[in-house]
């Protein structure tokens, strides 16, 4: 029985590689400077990552999010020396109560710029990101990241502009423009010290409706979650299509697209393997660089899927067009 399962697994993976070949050919012109990427926000081990085969690694600046767990410049250099591009996760739309900047007094004496706790993510609080007090906190965070030797920053909660519009605090256009301006300020700040620093926003790609072209020209790429699947459930085609319109526009301007869907339930079932491969096929067909994360949303491990992720077998194909 186990022999039969192995044979079927090989068939499934082989079919995926065949379809991937045709996918690469059909998506000629996509800007895809990396074959793969890693997204791990807890317990990331620089030594393990350096020999993993992943080309770009989005990790937290700290092993456990705390100040005491900060990676040393020497640890980040291990990845750089191995040819891995280390990118630091930074939440610019919410304050996190386990970070070095958090003050216990804020629980009872809330600053004007600090909003409500996000019910979906306990310990995360919406912030009025256009306030100078918050910007100064973020810039101090970025100083640490730059000093550590990271090669890029991964800016989360771009979509928080929608929250403040829905709360009626400011108009949607104003909220979007303030977030765009903040990202532009961040890019200018970090690139004064490191001109080649990658700037990668995550989600909230519809903010481009309010962009005059500066944001699209400034970012290095864009990252998206849940583009094709919501955990293990496939999304409706029209829902995906509405987001892809923004991403394709960015990609055609020479910006790479990182995609992470939480499709892997951790089992070796054929259903799980087929779902992961389906996600990969859809992502690559639409110009995205995929990462199949565990469906528990924890991002607390390097999710290596034998024969699939990182997709070493796909590295032999050289038919992509780079610009």
Curated annotation (Swiss-Prot):
InterPro entries: Aldolase_TIM, GH114_TIM-barrel, Glycoside_hydrolase_SF, TM1410-rel, TM1410_Glycdase
Pfam families from the UniProt entry: Glyco_hydro_114 (PF03537)
NCBIfam families registered for this protein in UniProt: MJ1477/TM1410 family putative glycoside hydrolase (TIGR01370)
PANTHER family: PELA, PTHR35882:SF1
Protein known as: Uncharacterized protein TM_1410
Organism: Thermotoga maritima (strain ATCC 43589 / DSM 3109 / JCM 10099 / NBRC 100826 / MSB8)
């Amino acid at each position: 029985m186990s022999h039969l399962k192995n044979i079927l697994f090989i068939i499934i993976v082989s079919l995926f590689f065949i379809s991937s070949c045709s996918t690469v050919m059909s998506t000629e012109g996509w800007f895809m400077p990396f074959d793969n990427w890693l997204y791990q926000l807890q317990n990331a081990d620089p030594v393990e990552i350096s020999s993993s085969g992943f080309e770009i690694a989005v990790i937290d600046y700290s092993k456990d999010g705390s100040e005491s767990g900060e990676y040393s410049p020497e640890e980040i250099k291990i990845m750089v020396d191995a040819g891995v591009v280390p990118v630091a996760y930074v939440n610019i739309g919410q304050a996190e109560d386990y970070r070095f900047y958090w003050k216990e007094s804020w629980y009872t004496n809330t600053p004007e710029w600090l909003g409500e706790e996000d019910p979906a993510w306990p310990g995360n609080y919406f912030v009025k990101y256009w306030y100078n007090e918050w910007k100064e906190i973020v810039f101090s965070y970025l100083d640490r990241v730059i000093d550590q030797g990271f090669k890029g920053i991964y800016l989360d909660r771009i979509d928080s502009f929608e929250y403040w519009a829905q709360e009626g605090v400011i108009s949607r256009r104003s909220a979007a423009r303030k977030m765009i301006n903040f990202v532009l300020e961040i890019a200018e700040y970090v690139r004064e010290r490191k001109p080649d620093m990658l700037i990668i926003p995550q989600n909230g790609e519809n903010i481009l409706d309010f962009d005059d072209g500066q944001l699209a020209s400034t970012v290095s790429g864009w990252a998206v979650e849940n583009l094709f699947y919501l955990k293990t459930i496939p999304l409706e085609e029209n829902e995906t299509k509405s987001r892809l319109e923004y991403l394709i526009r960015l990609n055609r301007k020479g910006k790479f697209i990182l995609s992470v869907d939480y499709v892997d339930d951790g089992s070796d079932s054929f259903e799980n393997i087929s779902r992961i491969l389906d996600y990969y096929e859809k992502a690559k067909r639409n110009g995205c660089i995929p990462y199949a994360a565990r469906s528990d949303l924890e991002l607390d491990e390097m999710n290596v899927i034998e024969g699939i992720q990182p997709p070493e077998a796909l590295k032999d194909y050289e038919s992509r067009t780079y610009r």
